[in-house]
């Protein structure tokens, strides 16, 4: 009789994402890179001169899990307002890691606001803004170097200020605002974005300043992904280990805005690239935070909520799966760190929920079975299922009141 050969012992496959090793960079009380959890950030949309409104907006974001908050600082008046915003947060709430967003010709603004925030974000394409010449056909090396020298002269005081205060800087490149000289030299490409960042990094390094985070954002996902991959490649070649801030700029709103952001951010995170993220939506900033945490949870990078496993439903399903999943979620959504499976029938139930802490499975009409891991604990009438699940979690000491 012919027999099948014994199966070769499979080598376990490590499924956890291996993150790129980066240097730790402080932003207030939060540290990004250096193996720290991927941090979540957003940006308020209030005018910074509205001090009361800005303080309230920062607090709203921080209270729902936004760990770093960015504020726009387009003028010296806005920069000075940040002192009052910071002080009010200290007095009425708590210190919040704050980032000042500085753009056009922002040297004086950046120097002023650096006194009051934890991190200054500059855009290399706009920090020293040269108005494009409409009839230009080329950039000579001399012209390129001349502007480079001006950039260094302008950037140096800010670098020294941040360095001496122990603060940090984000070199934030945007695909849509590359400097004219970069466009002429490298084109409207990921390479131009990377070289723009590297120019500023080299200036910072020459001044012994290494508290840097880098971002390369674009409104088109393929460009954003390519730019960040190339940035990592170039940094590896140059022996640099700066943390990366990920985001798809101008992603829009609604379902597609979330899909677009996830497509860019999650692709890179899955490759181990990225130390802090922002989902940019044309909605209230508070709407961005759950999307960020959802991405991190789905990839296994952070556990901040219940992980629900549920089948898509089919003809074998023995109860209204969508309705029951909703009830289970409403009863348990405030918990953290649990895996709960809701399965419609016995065919796929036990196997598909093998990694779950608790299972809710349809076995026969009108009844459901509750599982603790792989062990069936009890069978109860369907109407009592959710309450019985809650009692099981409580009995195991894993319940907290909402």
UniProtKB/Swiss-Prot annotation:
Binds 1 [4Fe-4S] cluster. Its cofactor is [4Fe-4S] cluster. Keywords: 4Fe-4S, Iron, Iron-sulfur, Isoprene biosynthesis, Metal-binding, Oxidoreductase. It is an enzyme of class 1 (oxidoreductase). NCBIfam families: ispG_gcpE (TIGR00612), PRK00366.1 (NF001540). It catalyses: (2E)-4-hydroxy-3-methylbut-2-enyl diphosphate + 2 oxidized [2Fe-2S]-[ferredoxin] + H2O = 2-C-methyl-D-erythritol 2,4-cyclic diphosphate + 2 reduced [2Fe-2S]-[ferredoxin] + H(+). Pathway: Isoprenoid biosynthesis; isopentenyl diphosphate biosynthesis via DXP pathway; isopentenyl diphosphate from 1-deoxy-D-xylulose 5-phosphate: step 5/6. [4Fe-4S] cluster binds at residues 311, 314, 345, 352. Pfam families: GcpE. This is 4-hydroxy-3-methylbut-2-en-1-yl diphosphate synthase (ferredoxin). Belongs to the IspG family. The keyword Iron applies. GO terms for biological process: isopentenyl diphosphate biosynthetic process, methylerythritol 4-phosphate pathway; terpenoid biosynthetic process. InterPro entries: Dihydropteroate_synth-like_sf (IPR011005), IspG_bac (IPR016425), IspG_bac-typ (IPR004588), NO2/SO3_Rdtase_4Fe4S_sf (IPR045854). GO terms for molecular function: 4 iron, 4 sulfur cluster binding; 4-hydroxy-3-methylbut-2-en-1-yl diphosphate synthase activity (ferredoxin); electron transfer activity; iron ion binding. Converts 2C-methyl-D-erythritol 2,4-cyclodiphosphate (ME-2,4cPP) into 1-hydroxy-2-methyl-2-(E)-butenyl 4-diphosphate, using ferredoxin I (PetF) as the reducing agent. Its EC number is 1.17.7.1.
């Amino acid at each position: 009789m012919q027999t099948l050969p014994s199966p070769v012992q499979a080598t376990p496959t490590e499924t956890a994402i291996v993150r790129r090793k980066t240097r730790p960079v402080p932003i207030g009380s939060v540290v990004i890179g250096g193996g720290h959890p991927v941090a979540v950030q957003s940006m308020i949309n209030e005018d910074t001169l509205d001090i009361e409104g800005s303080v309230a907006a920062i607090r709203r974001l921080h209270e729902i899990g936004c760990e770093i908050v960015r504020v726009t600082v387009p003028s010296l008046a806005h920069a000075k307002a940040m002192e009052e915003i910071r002080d009010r947060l200290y007095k009425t709430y708590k210190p919040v890691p704050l980032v000042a967003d500085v753009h056009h010709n922002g040297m004086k603004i950046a120097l002023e606001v650096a006194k009051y925030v934890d991190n200054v974000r500059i855009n290399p394409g706009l920090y020293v803004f040269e108005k494009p010449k409409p009839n230009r056909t080329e950039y000579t090396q001399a012209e390129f170097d001349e502007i480079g020298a001006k950039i260094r002269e302008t950037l140096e005081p800010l670098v020294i200020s941040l360095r001496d205060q122990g603060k940090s800087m984000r070199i934030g490149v945007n695909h849509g605002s590359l400097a004219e000289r970069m466009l002429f030299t490298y084109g409207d490409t990921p390479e131009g974005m990377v070289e723009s960042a590297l120019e500023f990094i080299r200036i910072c390094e020459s001044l012994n300043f290494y508290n840097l985070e880098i971002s390369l954002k674009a409104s088109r996902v393929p460009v954003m992904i390519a730019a960040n991959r190339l940035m990592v490649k170039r940094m590896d070649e140059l022996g640099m280990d700066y943390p990366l801030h990920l985001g798809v700029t101008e992603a829009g709103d609604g379902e597609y805005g979330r899909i677009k952001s996830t497509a860019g951010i999650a692709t890179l995170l899955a490759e181990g690239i990225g130390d802090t993220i922002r989902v940019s939506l044309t909605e209230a900033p508070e709407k961005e935070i759950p999307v960020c945490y959802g991405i991190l949870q789905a990839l296994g990078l952070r556990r901040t909520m219940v992980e629900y496993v549920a089948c898509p439903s089919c003809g074998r399903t023995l109860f209204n799966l969508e309705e029951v999943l909703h009830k289970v979620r409403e009863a348990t959504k405030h918990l953290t760190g649990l895996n709960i499976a809701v399965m419609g029938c016995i065919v796929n139930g036990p196997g598909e929920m093998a990694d779950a802490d608790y299972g809710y499975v349809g076995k026969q009409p009108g009844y459901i079975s509750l599982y603790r891991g792989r062990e069936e604990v009890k069978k109860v009438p369907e109407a009592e299922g959710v309450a019985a699940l809650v009692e099981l979690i409580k009995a195991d000491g894993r319940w907290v009141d909402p």
